[in-house]
């Protein structure tokens, strides 16, 4: 039986993580290497001439040129933190490695911190990851689908147009070997040509080949200079649609995450 190489790709195990980031000194050195890979540079005047004030991971770096002081975590999501760096690094590891998501409550139990602290860590880390990825445009080949988040409401509409459903676009870029590379999950005002055109211009690189079902509004990706390749799926099963394999996988994982980690969510947070 052949193994799925994507599912079984090598990650960082907990022992590997602890060997690399198990102490405050290791975490501080990792931040320093990421922030100043070629040595200290003053964030104000770019001078490398400096001296160190204090000691340990809370030490300050003072520029000899402009006298500006900065710390390892200044300007980062860890700025002004009173938590150990090891707690931050472990939180980042747990959240980024959880395939089916990790709730703030589960993070609290894993880290041994209060729920408000775990919630704040959860919010900051997820927001930082989203901000980092937001400017990236999908390219080459993209699988595109429409989806809704929401539950049942007695007496309300069902399906598209339901007042209890939030429409969003799911898109996955794949490389020349058919392997998934990047995903986009974005809330849209609705599945109209105007909304999809606006989304495509922000999230798709010109020249991208876009595979979608026959939903008419998806033809608006052409406004972003993309090649639209629609396919009317009808009653076909997901296994019969290799062109949508990865976007269907992403949507399946999303539903598993919401059901298993969060159970429910406030849709105002998606806007």
Label each residue range with its predicted role.
Residues 1-271:
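Residue-level recognition of single "structural anchor" positions
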